[in-house]
UniProtKB/Swiss-Prot annotation:
UniProt xrefs under Gene3D superfamilies: Aconitase, domain 3
Protein name: 3-isopropylmalate dehydratase large subunit
Designated gene of the protein: leuC
Annotated metabolic or biological route of this protein: Amino-acid biosynthesis; L-leucine biosynthesis; L-leucine from 3-methyl-2-oxobutanoate: step 2/4
Catalytic reaction equation(s): (2R,3S)-3-isopropylmalate = (2S)-2-isopropylmalate
Length: 471
């Protein structure tokens, strides 16, 4: 038998129909739905007189547009209409929905794992680019467009071109204060925003294996920012322990049988990737983006680069335009960049471990004058747990705003935005022009780095604040 990568194993297991020179027809195990990319898809079914083929393999929630302060009032008409439409569509087509009043509501890429819907070996799709998050469980998960959402609703299948495979091997150990967010920013910073184009990435190596499931989700979440179709990590005992007793995960003997099957989901010895890249985790520092792509970043002890340092005219122009938008000058120390806003949240970094990491920095301190700081849990379950652990009170005592769950300030399509010309330390995944609001200047960082920026009013090296043992 020819050795296979885990990517090839999952793909081949789900091919319904294959024809040379054409896309494969894949079976989809889990379809996650939210209010923004689904209305037209459901309307398409309605117009054609079709039903949702597998409502039992479909799960919906409201996240992108939801208010995070007063949920009883949705002032934006577009947002209100989208949420009303999702509620109506789920009721009509029999799709389970975690609405604003549900204790299971949250960001779709947070609740999928915490409810146990996300499982190793599954094909998972959602009308959202950061569906790659679920790859942390050894699933093949990727975002799709609205027309594809309709196709999956109607057929539980999807036409897809077979991707190339890439191993991203992260060796060594991380220093205290260096997080999964720093690892993925360092990878993108080293190899670029398009090095993964046409590939599914498998993250391997000692650094990855030592990570918790929530750290692995951060890594896979930003695979798309490297241009990849998806990213995944082979499941192991960490994965199985996380899933045990989750609401929708198998129970009892069925769980043990599932684990035995999941253990086969690994890349065979001798399997050949289309490409292999390496990065030494020991060399990674806390990282801050200074530009308008996730690749435009520097270690915290670095400086804003000079456009003239770049090799090509295209690169020089891109850096020049980015610095102009960000209002930064070459040579500025990263620690001298002041922030007016801090956002701890998003599908990248809003889980309980992220909030614990940030609270550790914040405890006993106060938010700096002139800084507005928000903490937005990724789900109502995360919110409840943080409140029970006293983490929420730590943030409140420090002067942070403590919110309900939702996508919030990650994207400028709800009430939580950053004013033009102001800088935000954000634990989200994208720093494009206008991402957090028209003219907003976004710096991507880890939860610890964001928390420290809130306290000091500028970026600081969190390694000086940590006294933990090296992972």
């Amino acid at each position: 038998m020819v050795p296979k990568t885990i990517i090839e194993k999952i793909w081949d297991e789900h091919v319904v129909y294959r024809e040379d020179g054409k896309p494969d027809l894949l079976y989809i195990d889990l379809h996650l739905v939210h209010e923004v990319t689904s209305p037209q898809a459901f309307e398409g079914l309605r117009q054609k007189g079709r039903k949702v083929r597998r409502p039992d393999l479909t799960f919906a929630t409201m996240d992108h547009n939801v208010p995070t302060i007063n949920r009883s009032v949705v002032e934006d008409e577009v947002a209100k209409n989208q949420m009303t439409a999702l509620e109506r569509n789920c009721r009509e087509f029999g799709v389970p929905l975690a609405d604003l009043n549900s204790p299971e509501q949250g960001i779709v890429h947070v609740i999928g794992p915490e409810l146990g819907l996300t499982q190793p070996g599954k094909t998972i799709v959602c009308g959202d680019s950061h569906t790659s998050t679920h790859g942390a469980f050894g699933a093949l998960a990727f975002g799709i467009g609205t027309s594809e959402v309709e196709h999956v609703l109607a057929t539980q299948t999807l036409w897809q071109h077979r991707p190339k495979t890439m191993q991203v091997n992260v060796t060594g150990s991380l220093a205290p204060g260096v997080s999964a967010k720093d690892v993925i920013l360092a990878i993108i910073g080293k190899f670029g925003v398009d090095f993964g184009t046409g590939y599914v990435l498998e993250f391997t190596g000692d650094v990855i294996r030592r990570m918790s499931m929530e750290e692995r989700m951060t890594i896979c979440n930003m695979s798309i920012e490297a241009g990849a179709r998806a990213g995944l990590i082979a499941p192991d005992d960490v994965t199985f322990a996380y899933l045990k007793e989750r609401k929708y995960a198998p129970k009892g003997e069925a769980f043990e049988q599932a684990v035995e099957k999941w253990k086969q989901l690994c890349t065979d010895e001798g399997a050949v990737y289309d490409r292999v890249v390496h990065i030494d985790g020991s060399e990674i520092a806390p990282t801050v983006t200074w530009g308008t792509t996730p690749a435009m970043s520097s270690p915290i002890d670095g400086t804003v680069p000079d456009p003239n340092e770049f090799a090509t005219e295209t690169e020089r122009k891109a850096v020049q335009l980015a610095l102009q938008y960000m209002g930064l000058k070459p040579g500025t120390k990263m620690t001298d960049i002041a922030v007016q806003h801090v956002f701890i949240g998003s599908c990248t970094n809003s889980r309980i471990s992220d909030l614990r990491e940030a609270a550790q920095i914040v405890k006993g301190k106060k938010v700096a004058p002139g800084v507005r700081a928000l903490v937005v849990p990724g789900s109502q379950q995360v919110k409840k747990q943080a409140e029970e652990e006293g983490i929420a009170q730590t943030f409140i005592d420090a002067g942070f705003e403590w919110r309900d769950s939702g996508c919030s300030m990650c994207l400028g399509m709800n009430p939580d935005t950053v004013p033009a010309g102001e800088h935000c330390a954000s634990t989200s995944n994208r720093n494009f022009e206008g991402r957090q609001g028209k003219g907003a200047r976004t710096h991507l960082v880890s939860p610890a780095m964001a928390a420290a920026a809130a306290i000091y009013g500028h970026f600081v090296d969190v390694r000086t604040l940590y006294k933990e043992v090296v992972r």
